[in-house]
């Protein structure tokens, strides 16, 4: 997409229609890269597909897992990708050549895994029916540190009786990398010190299980998805006292939610519905009002992600494994690129001047042939601290 030909004042804040469907294997989980150039898709057979969003073609296919991919996580530089699978393994991939940097075999199937924001050799993993682990890989040798699940406060009798059933379902790093944020099956939200693996603070967000926690692009808010059918947004500017801002739910139908997240600006939140609804709900975060219901596929939508730059949403179909993309159908404004360009409402008859197609001299013709016109323009990156990683193309002979 050529950004210079788009009218910035005509772009809405959220997608409006289903525009593209991607299909390569049966997808289970997806994530956009931090710069928005690529989309990582984990498949049910253990493969990982990297999509090029400029051409909607496959850039790489990574094979290393033997069972379904549970989660994919990009590094901050977009060069590395961490994948977690039901085969009890986590693999870090180098997308420059598709090689494996390291792989770690854990003690149980992995719910999800999240990279450290600044260190690619450190990640945290949430395991099935076991305590989460902080893994640090030094010289190819992983060091495991178990993270706590139960809060360091007095619990009532029923909580003590069901202590064995209290497990961590989701965990990831704070943007600073100093803390690990986790959610449990009893609705507890923990802030864990990454250096000491001790709980700094615990807060009861809900009485039901916390299925998912996502971080906003501005790194100041969290969105919680729990089994009580309520989506909550929480401010984490003060980690010792997180504040629940808004609650989103379908009061009439009492829908359960599969996945949720923030828009790229943080002004909207979205969630996919469970079972029969086949839609994505979009709310305005400030007012809490429902602004859009994205429909189209005739199947349940599981994982969902919002593009980091454009108002674009990608989601995975449960039955077919296809990737559906909702976006805004943009009309390129050539007058924004060339001020003297005139747009016509309808065709007009053109009167040809007598000398328009006269033969020019050979000197002018040779100068035109020697003049090189670039048809590809790479826009500069906003960050001056580090140039973004650009994945080299993979040429395959058919």
Curated annotation (Swiss-Prot):
Gene Ontology BP annotations: transcription initiation-coupled chromatin remodeling
Segments annotated as WD repeats: 22-61, 64-103, 162-202, 247-295, 296-336
Protein localization: Nucleus
Principal place of residence: nucleus
InterPro entries named among the record's database cross-references: RBBP5/Swd1 (IPR037850), WD40/YVTN_repeat-like_dom_sf (IPR015943), WD40_repeat_CS (IPR019775), WD40_repeat_dom_sf (IPR036322), WD40_rpt (IPR001680)
Coiled-coil segments on the chain, per record: none
Gene Ontology cellular-component terms listed: chromatin; cytosol; nucleus; Set1C/COMPASS complex
Region forming the signal peptide: none
Subunit structure as annotated in this protein's UniProt entry: Component of the Set1 complex composed of ash2, sdc1, set1, shg1, spp1, swd1, swd2 and swd3.
The protein, known as: Set1 complex component swd1
Organism of derivation: Schizosaccharomyces pombe (strain 972 / ATCC 24843)
């Amino acid at each position: 997409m050529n950004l210079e030909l788009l009218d910035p004042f005509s772009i809405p804040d959220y997608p409006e229609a289903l525009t593209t469907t991607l299909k390569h294997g049966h997808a289970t989980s997806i994530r956009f890269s931090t710069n928005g150039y690529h989309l990582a898709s984990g498949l049910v057979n253990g493969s990982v597909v990297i999509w090029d969003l400029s051409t909607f073609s496959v850039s790489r296919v990574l094979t290393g897992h033997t069972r379904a991919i549970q989660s994919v996580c990009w590094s901050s530089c977009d060069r590395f990708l961490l994948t977690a699978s039901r085969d009890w393994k986590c693999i870090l991939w180098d997308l420059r050549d598709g090689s494996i940097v390291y792989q770690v075999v854990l003690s149980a199937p992995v719910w999800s895994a999240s990279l450290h924001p600044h260190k690619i050799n450190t990640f945290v993993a949430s395991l099935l029916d076991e305590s989460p682990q902080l893994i640090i890989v030094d010289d190819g040798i992983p060091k495991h540190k178990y993270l706590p699940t139960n809060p360091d406060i007095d619990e009532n009798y029923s909580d003590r009786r069901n202590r064995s059933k209290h497990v961590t379902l989701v965990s990831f790093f704070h943007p600073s990398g100093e803390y690990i944020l986790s959610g449990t099956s009893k609705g507890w939200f923990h802030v864990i010190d990454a250096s000491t693996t001790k709980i700094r603070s615990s807060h009861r967000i809900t009485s039901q299980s916390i299925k998912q926690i996502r971080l906003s692009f501005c790194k100041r808010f969290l969105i919680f998805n729990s089994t009580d059918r309520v989506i909550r947004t929480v401010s984490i500017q003060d980690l010792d006292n997180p504040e629940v801002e808004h609650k989103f739910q379908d009061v009439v139908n009492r829908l359960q939610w599969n996945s949720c997240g923030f828009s790229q600006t943080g002004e909207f939140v979205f969630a996919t519905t469970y079972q029969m609804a086949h839609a994505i709900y979009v709310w305005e975060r400030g007012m809490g009002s429902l602004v859009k219901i994205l429909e189209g596929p005739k199947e349940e939508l599981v994982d969902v992600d919002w593009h980091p730059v454009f108002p674009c949403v990608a989601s995975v179909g449960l039955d077919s494994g296809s990737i559906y993309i909702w976006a805004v159908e943009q009309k390129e404004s050539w007058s924004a690129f060339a001020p003297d360009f005139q747009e016509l409402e309808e065709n007009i008859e053109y009167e040809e001047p007598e000398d328009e197609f006269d033969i020019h001299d050979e000197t002018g013709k040779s100068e035109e042939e020697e003049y090189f016109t670039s048809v590809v323009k790479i826009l500069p990156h906003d960050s001056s601290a580090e140039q973004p990683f650009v994945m080299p193309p993979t040429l395959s002979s058919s």
